[in-house]
């Protein structure tokens, strides 16, 4: 596979935003670390899993398989010859991943030059910070309140 242009990646994410409303790009494409072997990682709240699976049954995807990573699914999008990794998260984790991704993007840390294990350690620390602050507050009905800059879809 080739590394996709960010415009194309965002078009793909926007397609899923129209289906499931709340999702955002995460992983190597989000953090400017994509290689020719990279999947497009998209995070969703767990409530979006059934609607997404239903949608995938209607479009041209191949190699649909369940992933043990956060109740996810992995599939190949034939139209762009790219594998998509859909990650489904509890609303609290969804909010924390979103906040952590924004924090990492806003930091001055050269993420694309970090070793994989160093990046993953930093990512886990960033996810833990908001989780410590809001862990007793986030539910499946109010999680959007904690993502005030996500207006009807994705913000990168």
Give residue ranges: language-model regions.
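Catalytic core of pol beta-like nucleotidyltransferases
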Residues: 1-37, 44-156
């Amino acid at each position: 596979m080739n590394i996709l242009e960010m415009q194309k990646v965002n078009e793909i994410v926007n397609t899923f935003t129209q289906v499931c409303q709340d999702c955002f790009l995460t992983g190597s494409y989000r953090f400017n670390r994509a290689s020719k072997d990279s999947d497009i990682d998209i995070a969703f709240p767990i409530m979006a899993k059934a609607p997404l699976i239903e949608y995938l049954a209607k479009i041209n995807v191949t190699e649909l398989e369940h992933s043990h990573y956060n109740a996810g699914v992995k599939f190949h999008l034939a139209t762009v010859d790219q594998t998509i990794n859909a990650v489904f998260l509890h609303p609290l984790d969804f909010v924390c991943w979103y906040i952590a991704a924004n924090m990492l993007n806003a930091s001055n840390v050269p993420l694309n030059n970090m070793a994989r294990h160093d990046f993953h350690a930093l990512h886990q620390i960033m996810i833990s910070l908001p989780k410590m602050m809001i862990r007793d507050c986030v539910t499946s009905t109010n999680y959007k309140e904690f993502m005030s800059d996500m207006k009807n879809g994705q913000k990168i």
